[in-house]
Amino acid sequence: VTCSYARLFCSPASAQRAAPAQQPQQVDVLVRGGTLVDGTGSQGRAADVGIRGDRIVFVGNASASRVTGSRTIEAAGLIVAPGFIDPHTHTGGDLSNAERKSNLPYLMQGVTTVLTNNDGGGPVDIGAQLAGWTRNGIGTNAAVYIGQGSVRGAVLGPTAAAPTPRQLDSMRAVVARAMNDGAIGMSTGLYYAPGSFATTDEVIELAKVAAAHGGNYDSHLRDESSYTIGLLGAVSEAIRIGREAHLPIHISHIKALGADVWGQADTVIALIRSAQREGIKVSADQYPYTASGTSVGASLLPRWAEAGGRDSLRMRVADPATRTRLVAEMEVNMKRRGGAASLLISSTRDTSILGKRLDAIAVARHTTPVEAGLQIILAGDASVASFNMKDSDIEKFMVQDFVSTGSDGSDGHPRKYGTFPRLLREYVYTKHVLTLPQ
């Protein structure tokens, strides 16, 4: 049964008014005997839950209230909770696929609502995306962003050039249409091309359009490490966008990625708290893994090398002077990630390298890790699990009241199907970083 989060919170008072104890009532499904943890932060309590259609219509003592169910689920010894909301997924493709539209990797974790088109991606025709899901049906509730990277790519292509006034107006129009068609805000992936080519001012102009339609700003930061402006600079940039565009901001998969920024969690938290005191609405999500998920290209290539797309990259590689510069900067980026052994191929069309680390691939190919990485990129790239975070930073972010859990799920990384179980097992029941009500 898929029920919305908001409805569960609203239902108890209204349900009890609608169903006095002396009047028997029948529900479709009665979940009986469980411990209800309702998401408000309150301690769990014994309560039965009655569902009719797609609504929760009763929360309380079913026997005392004479509530019976056409179907009864015995939940003694189990926790009953609202369906989880995952604020950061990459489920757009799955929901549009006839064989995967049920979204089982999420439903099986207890996730009943997903947000998607994060990281500045997804289609620009939001109306068509939502209409397709409505027509064909999907397994979870879903909400979508309009991706700034997709918007920029649609108007400017893969160029790093600044938009002309006319092009900027065109991008504004795309965002406005998407918001009118049902997007809840604008997402950015300022670490990824082509979104990374936008200046802060350019992003602010598009965010203002989302704000005018009541939307929020969701961002994969421009830098979660020390690639360009640094983690602290990137957090400050996101806060500036919220301040100047006048909209709430949400930082995706908040983290300190790589040894250069390990230990900066406290400073990041202080920046966010300062912005909140200023009146800016700031929230974040994270996944409970020390390995991030990205591509070989995004891990190793400097941002300038991505301008113009794959064909332009091939031309740069073919030029001896440019190649020398490229390889040198890729070496630095590999060290930021923790070295070649920290990059595990998690999804690729080349099955010969699937499940292998980049250092082992380099040995098998009799070349250096950077050259092996460049070969993979030019052959179409591959997804990697990148082991680059410390538990101490993860836990400091986790306990903040503005941080929720989001999977950032992608093929090949266990976070797509294991984020919420891992959070409960590892950080609630084993390490006691969080309590169950939290």
Regions found by a protein language model. Name each.
Residues 23-28, 36-83:
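Histidine-rich, glycine-flanked metal-binding segment
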Residues 62, 119-120, 189-191, 221-223, ...:
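Short, ordered loop/turn segments at secondary-structure junctions
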Residues 99-101, 200-205, 232-237, 266-268, ...:
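Charged helix-capping and loop-helix junction motifs
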Residues 13-15, 21:
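Boundary at the C-terminal end of the N-terminal hydrophobic targeting segment
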Residues 75-80, 84-91, 95-188, 207-208, ...:
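Divalent-metal coordination cores built from histidine and acidic residues
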Residues 145-146, 150, 154-165, 169-193, ...:
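Active-site neighborhoods of metal-dependent hydrolases
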Residues 177, 183-236:
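Divalent metal-binding pocket/active-site signature
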